[in-house]
């Protein structure tokens, strides 16, 4: 029962933290230079998550406070708001990195994690925009309070011994280069189709919560190339008939393609000596950046 509860708590927190969501919203109507500045900030904060880190000594209360105060201050004048958003993105990236590692390191139930994420994502819909500060902090609070007990569990400490930081010199020697090339090609294919869809389907400004839910699917996998082909058919159909249904179909198949890659990475690399959680976190952040930037 405790494992089930902890898994649900991790899912709530993962769904509440979408790195870059609020900073990318700030780029609407801004100059190209300002947009480039946001992307650079996101990239730097992402790279900093790869530094040497021991989850046993992490205290999430610091990032929790920053996220809460940053969201509270989001309506400040533009310059101050930009400074606040920089602080927010750094904390979001770190929280997401911690959560990605914990989900893989700690014994957890994937369906419970997914259910928690769906609950959090539902409350990020536009009907709850006025309560975004309340809902985000409410879903992060259980993880913040529970983290200390989680990492002291025997299962966590035993599993932690298998892992080393991703930048260890011996980490990538254990991975077949052809294996990484295959995933890189699949990443690039889906990212290219995503940008094509954004250009030709006139995707509206929204939270894309349906897409994010499908991306985090843990129940079944679809061949990436089949998913890409179906997404292209949806784009062509949307060009001929401007119906929102095709945008939904496009996001569904594209999300299934991304989730298939993440599921394969999670299952194949989980027992390797480096943090598969770092790869999954980086992949998710790239997907968010590609989907939200410039929409």
Curated annotation (Swiss-Prot):
<keyword id="KW-0472">Membrane</keyword>
<protein>
    <recommendedName>
        <fullName>Protein U26</fullName>
    </recommendedName>
</protein>
<dbReference type="Pfam" id="PF07402">
    <property type="entry name" value="Herpes_U26"/>
</dbReference>
<feature type="transmembrane region" description="Helical">
    <location>
        <begin position="33"/>
        <end position="53"/>
    </location>
</feature>
<dbReference type="InterPro" id="IPR009980">
    <property type="entry name" value="Herpes_U26"/>
</dbReference>
<feature type="transmembrane region" description="Helical">
    <location>
        <begin position="131"/>
        <end position="151"/>
    </location>
</feature>
<feature type="transmembrane region" description="Helical">
    <location>
        <begin position="218"/>
        <end position="238"/>
    </location>
</feature>
<keyword id="KW-0812">Transmembrane</keyword>
<keyword id="KW-1043">Host membrane</keyword>
<feature type="transmembrane region" description="Helical">
    <location>
        <begin position="274"/>
        <end position="294"/>
    </location>
</feature>
<feature type="transmembrane region" description="Helical">
    <location>
        <begin position="243"/>
        <end position="263"/>
    </location>
</feature>
<feature type="transmembrane region" description="Helical">
    <location>
        <begin position="183"/>
        <end position="203"/>
    </location>
</feature>
<dbReference type="GO" id="GO:0016020">
    <property type="term" value="C:membrane"/>
</dbReference>
<feature type="transmembrane region" description="Helical">
    <location>
        <begin position="66"/>
        <end position="86"/>
    </location>
</feature>
<feature type="transmembrane region" description="Helical">
    <location>
        <begin position="103"/>
        <end position="123"/>
    </location>
</feature>
<keyword id="KW-1133">Transmembrane helix</keyword>
<dbReference type="GO" id="GO:0033644">
    <property type="term" value="C:host cell membrane"/>
</dbReference>
């Amino acid at each position: 029962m405790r494992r089930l509860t902890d898994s649900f708590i991790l899912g709530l927190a993962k769904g509440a933290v979408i790195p870059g969501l609020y900073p990318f919203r700030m780029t609407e109507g801004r100059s190209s230079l300002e947009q480039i500045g946001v992307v650079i900030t996101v990239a730097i904060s992402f790279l900093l998550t790869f530094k040497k880190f021991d989850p046993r000594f992490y205290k999430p209360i610091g990032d929790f406070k920053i996220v809460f105060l940053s969201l509270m201050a989001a309506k400040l004048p533009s310059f101050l708001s930009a400074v606040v958003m920089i602080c927010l993105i750094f904390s979001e990236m770190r929280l997401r990195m911690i959560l990605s590692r914990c989900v893989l390191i700690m014994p957890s139930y994937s369906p419970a994690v997914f259910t928690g994420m769906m609950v959090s994502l539902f409350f990020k819909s536009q009907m709850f925009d006025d309560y975004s500060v309340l809902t985000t902090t409410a879903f992060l609070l259980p993880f913040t309070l529970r983290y200390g007990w989680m990492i002291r569990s025997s299962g966590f400490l035993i599993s932690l011994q298998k892992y080393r930081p991703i930048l260890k010199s011996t980490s990538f020697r254990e991975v077949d280069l052809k294996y990484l090339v295959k995933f890189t090609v699949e990443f690039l294919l889906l990212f290219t189709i995503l940008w094509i869809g954004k250009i030709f389907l006139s995707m509206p400004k929204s939270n894309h919560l349906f897409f994010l839910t499908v991306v985090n699917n843990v129940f079944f996998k679809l061949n990436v190339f089949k998913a890409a082909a179906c997404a292209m058919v949806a784009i062509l159909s949307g060009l001929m008939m401007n119906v929102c249904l095709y945008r939904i179909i496009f996001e569904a198949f594209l999300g299934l393609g991304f989730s298939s890659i993440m599921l394969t990475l999670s299952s194949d690399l989980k027992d390797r000596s480096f943090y598969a959680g770092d790869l999954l976190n980086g992949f998710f952040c790239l997907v968010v950046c590609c989907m939200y930037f410039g929409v």
